[in-house]
C-alpha cells in the first residue's frame, strides 16, 4: 500500500469516530413529566366563568368601535412616529436642536427649552445671475453715511457708600443755536457747492539745527550788527578823542583810579602764574560738542601719523635688538 492510501484510511476512521460520539440527545416529551393523569378534567369556578363572559362582551363592543377608529389611529400613529424620529435625530446630533437656559433669579424654576434657529441655506447662483446682480449694484447710488459721529452717553451707576460725581452739563450757547438756525437755511446751498478737498502736503524732511543753537546764532548776528554800527560811528571821532573803554586806557588808570591792587596778579598767584586773559571766553563761542567733517578728517590724519611714528619706532627698536644679539654671538665665538 502506498503512503497516500494509508492517509485516506486514517482520515475516514477519525470522521466515523466523531460521528458516533456526537449522537443527538433524546427529546423530552412534556407528557412524560406531567404528574396529572391523562383522563383528568379540571372543573372551572363559576366566578371565573362570569369574568370570562364579561371580558368577551367587552371585547365584542370594543371590536365594533375599533373598526371606526382604525383610520384615525393610523393617522395618529404616523404623526407620533414622525415626532419620535425627530427627537431621535436631535439626540443623535448631540442635543444641538434644543438647549435649556436658566434665568438668573429662578434657580428652582423649571427649565424652558430654547429652540435654536437653523441658518437658511445659501442659494446657488450661476455665473450669469452673479454678473446681473453686480450690474444692478453698480447702477444703484452708493449710500453715504453721515460723517458726524453719534455720541452716546455712558450709563452712570450710583453705588452705595460712594459720592455721586456731579458731571457738568454742557449748555447750548446762544451763538451755537443761531448757527444751527442759519445752517438749516443754508443747507441747500452747501449741498450744491462741493467742498474743497484739503491735501496734507509732506513737510520738508531736511535736518534742522537745534533750537538752542538757532537762538545763539540769531543773538550773535544781532550783536555783530550793533557792533558794526557802533564802530562806524566811532571811526569818525577816533582822531582826537580817547576812548574810555579801551584796554590801554584801563591799564593806565588802574593805579590812579583803581581800588589799589591788581586783580590779574592776584588771580595769577592762585592759579600757578597763569594769566587771566587765557581763560576769558564767551559762552556763545563755546563748542557744541559736534564735530564737522573737516575736524573728523583732521583727527583721522593725526591718528594715521601717530600710528606711522609708532610703527617706525618699533621697527628701529627691533633692528637694534637684533644687532645686539648678533654682536653677543660674535663675541662669544
Swiss-Prot record:
Acidic residues bias spans: 229-247
Comp. bias (Basic and acidic residues): 117-141, 215-228, 312-325
Subcellular localization(s) per the UniProt record: Nucleus
Residues modified to N-acetylserine: 2
InterPro entries assigned to the protein according to its UniProt record, in alphabetical order: Chromatin_SPT2 (IPR013256)
Modification type Phosphoserine: residues: 126
Region (Important for interaction with histones): 259-333
Pfam families in the record: SPT2
Residue stretches of biased makeup (Polar residues): 1-20
Residue ranges with Low complexity bias: 180-193
Disulfide bond entries: none
MF terms (GO), sorted A to Z: DNA binding; DNA secondary structure binding; histone binding; histone chaperone activity
Stated role: Histone chaperone that stabilizes pre-existing histone tetramers and regulates replication-independent histone exchange on chromatin. Required for normal chromatin refolding in the coding region of transcribed genes, and for the suppression of spurious transcription. Global regulatory protein that plays positive as well as negative regulatory roles in transcription.
UniProt note: domains: The acidic C-terminal domain mediates interaction with histone H3/H4 complexes.
Subunit annotation: Interacts with tetramers formed by histone H3 and H4. Interacts with SAP1 and CDC23. Component of the SAGA complex, a large multiprotein complex that modifies the chromatin, at least composed of SPT2, SPT7, SPT8, SPT20/ADA5, HFI1/ADA1, ADA2, ADA3/NGG1, TRA1 and GCN5.
Protein name in the entry: Protein SPT2
Organism: Saccharomyces cerevisiae (strain ATCC 204508 / S288c)
Lineage per the UniProt record: Eukaryota, Fungi, Dikarya, Ascomycota, Saccharomycotina
Amino acid at each position: 500500500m502506498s503512503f497516500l492510501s494509508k492517509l485516506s484510511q486514517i482520515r475516514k476512521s477519525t470522521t466515523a469516530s466523531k460521528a458516533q460520539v456526537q449522537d443527538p440527545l433524546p427529546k423530552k416529551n412534556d407528557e412524560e413529566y406531567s404528574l396529572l393523569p391523562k383522563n383528568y378534567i379540571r372543573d372551572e369556578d363559576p366566578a371565573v366563568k362570569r369574568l370570562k363572559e364579561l371580558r368577551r362582551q367587552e371585547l365584542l363592543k370594543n371590536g365594533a368601535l375599533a373598526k371606526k377608529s382604525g383610520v384615525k389611529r393610523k393617522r395618529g400613529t404616523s404623526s407620533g412616529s414622525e415626532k419620535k424620529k425627530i427627537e431621535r435625530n436631535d439626540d443623535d446630533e448631540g442635543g444641538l436642536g434644543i438647549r435649556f437656559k436658566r434665568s438668573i433669579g429662578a434657580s428652582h424654576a423649571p427649565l424652558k427649552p430654547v429652540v435654536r434657529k437653523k441658518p437658511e441655506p445659501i442659494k446657488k447662483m450661476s455665473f450669469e445671475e452673479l454678473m446681473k446682480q453686480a450690474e444692478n449694484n453698480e447702477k444703484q447710488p452708493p449710500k453715504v453715511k453721515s460723517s458726524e459721529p453719534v455720541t452716546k452717553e455712558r450709563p452712570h451707576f450710583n453705588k452705595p457708600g460712594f459720592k455721586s460725581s456731579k458731571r457738568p452739563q454742557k449748555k447750548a450757547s446762544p451763538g451755537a443755536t443761531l448757527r444751527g438756525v442759519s445752517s438749516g437755511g443754508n443747507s441747500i446751498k452747501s449741498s450744491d457747492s462741493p467742498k474743497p478737498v484739503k491735501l496734507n502736503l509732506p513737510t520738508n524732511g531736511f535736518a534742522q539745527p537745534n533750537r538752542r543753537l538757532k537762538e545763539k546764532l540769531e543773538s550773535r548776528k544781532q550783536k555783530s550788527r550793533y557792533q558794526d554800527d557802533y564802530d562806524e560811528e566811532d571811526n569818525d571821532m577816533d582822531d582826537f578823542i580817547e576812548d574810555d573803554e579801551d584796554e590801554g586806557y584801563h591799564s593806565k588808570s588802574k593805579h590812579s583810579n583803581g581800588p589799589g591792587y591788581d586783580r590779574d596778579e592776584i588771580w595769577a598767584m592762585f592759579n600757578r602764574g597763569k594769566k587771566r586773559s587765557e581763560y576769558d571766553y564767551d559762552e556763545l563761542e563755546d563748542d557744541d560738542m559736534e564735530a564737522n567733517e573737516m575736524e573728523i578728517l583732521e583727527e583721522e590724519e593725526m591718528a594715521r601719523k601717530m600710528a606711522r611714528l609708532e610703527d617706525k619706532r618699533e621697527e628701529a627698536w627691533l633692528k637694534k635688538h637684533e644687532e645686539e644679539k648678533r654682536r653677543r654671538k660674535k663675541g662669544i665665538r
